[in-house]
Amino acid sequence: MSLKGKDFLSVHHLTVDEIYQIFDFARILKAKQKAGEPHPLLKGKTLGMIFQKASTRTRVSFEVGMWQLGGSALFLSSNDMQIGRGEPVKDTARVLSRYVDGIMIRTFSHLEVEELAEYATVPVINALTDLLHPCQAMADIFTALEHKGELKGRKLCYIGDGNNMVNSLLHICAKVGMDISVATPANYAPDATIVEQAAVAAKLSGSKITILDDPLAAAQDADVLYTDVWASMGKEGEQAIRKQAFAGFQINNTLLQAAKKDTIVMHCLPAHRGEEITEDVIEGPNSVVFDEAENRLHVQKAIMALLMAD
């Protein structure tokens, strides 16, 4: 079982064994980093990073990760590239493949990422699209594994917008055998195709998917409570409408009481405190938000090394 030379576009494309292979390697790399032990697995390698959406955690974690692995990362914004001026994606893919050893892309269109991967001859990593956020979901469930010790039979409850984040969480929870309950307002449900894909995986793993519009019901006996912003990047114009629609879809102390006593609280950040999550919960003892943010580094390093190392 080898991920060498493959793309990382979606958790849906991974086997359960491949998910745990990434987790196991992330655990090893995290221990090495904490011990100050060098691990230059990508010495002499370069990652080209295409950003059409701004980011804090994605850019820093990939750049630092490549540096810790002995390689280098090249930041490419759409303002700096011909892809931002109308060059075909397939041309960009083939040109960059002659210069770099891997391509990471954070953009709007998932179809664009798939086209990039089709024409690139080096591994392509999806760092976020409007449809999926697989690197974040992998880091989230790795964090749950660290804190809970076992994933199968655990329950994750997601409260909020049916966006790219919950789409990837549906994929991974179904794969690893975690139950997932999703509470969203009417008209803000997760992508129907993603739900169908997750349902197929859930049948194989024995997990359960529940989608409803009642946050308290969704949170009952949850091992993990998860939320994200009400208006994702590109949806800022809908802020006022969404504030009204999502009123009540908030992780707060009332919701915390419905979940298990030892539930962990997650948010992929940035958080709008007082909207999708309260200040006291994100800063409280159940919150693992910053463990989760750190684990982006370790999980992404594992992905890069498994895809790009000789």
Can you name each region flagged by the protein language model?
Residues 1-60, 64:
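Positively charged, low-complexity intrinsically disordered leader regions
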Residues 36-145, 273:
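Phosphate/diphosphate ligand-binding glycine-rich loop within oxidoreductases
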Residues 42-47, 152-154, 262:
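Phosphate-coordination loops involved in phosphoryl transfer and adenosine-cofactor binding
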Residues 52-64, 148-227:
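Glycine-rich phosphate/diphosphate-binding loop of Rossmann-like nucleotide-binding domains
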Residues 69, 99, 119-121, 176, ...:
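Short, structured coil segments at secondary-structure junctions
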Residues 200-279:
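Rossmann-like adenosine-cofactor binding region
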Residues 262-263, 269-310:
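Adenosine-phosphate binding glycine-rich loop
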